């Protein structure tokens, strides 16, 4: 799944970044949607609010698959209110064990006032060791830039925007049209 020309590799063509600092959580994504080597759209929104605006969620991967997973996550949050980690683990269990869900191709970052998590189809729910996490083709560039800026910038959004711009300058599957969601924590 690493060849960007392969249509199955479509989930690699994006960047989503989450940064926590000084009472603020910010999640950003680029807007580029690529199919193989073709840019299909430049202003897609890959970050959004769920659970009544209390949780920020971003995705890399097939859009329909991601929305299916967001709906499932919201159902888990209704069952386990204010327990993002528990809901994420329950979603990961379903994603790993239900045949229908196993075919979904997406990665999710979800965050509330207390935690930031990456949820994968392999059944992983990962909480980053640092206050920064990213996914997608430009994710490593954005992550490295954000971690490098973290000690020198006071504002989470400033860190996020600068890091995303660096990723957009390096990764051909990431553009400079950013969607930004913030949450006071």
Swiss-Prot record:
The name under which this protein is listed is ATP-dependent protease subunit HslV
Where along the chain is Na(+) bound?
168, 171, 174
Q: How is its activity regulated?
A: Allosterically activated by HslU binding.
General function of this protein: Protease subunit of a proteasome-like degradation complex believed to be a general protein degrading machinery.
GO terms, biological process: proteolysis involved in protein catabolic process
What's a single GO MF annotation on this record?
Answer: threonine-type endopeptidase activity
Fill in the subunit field for this protein.
A double ring-shaped homohexamer of HslV is capped on each side by a ring-shaped HslU homohexamer. The assembly of the HslU/HslV complex is dependent on binding of ATP.
Hey, which family's this protein in? Belongs to the peptidase T1B family. HslV subfamily.
Kindly give the InterPro entries that the UniProt entry links to this protein.
ATP-dep_Prtase_HsIV_su (IPR022281), Ntn_hydrolases_N (IPR029055), Proteasome_sua/b (IPR001353), Proteasome_suB-type (IPR023333)
> What's the catalysed reaction?
ATP-dependent cleavage of peptide bonds with broad specificity
HAMAP family documented for this protein:
HslV
Q: What species does this protein belong to?
A: Hyphomonas neptunium (strain ATCC 15444)
Q: Report the main location listed first in the record.
A: cytoplasm
Active-site residues annotated for this sequence: 14
Claim: Transcription is one of the keywords in the record: no
Give the matching SUPFAM superfamilies: N-terminal nucleophile aminohydrolases (Ntn hydrolases)
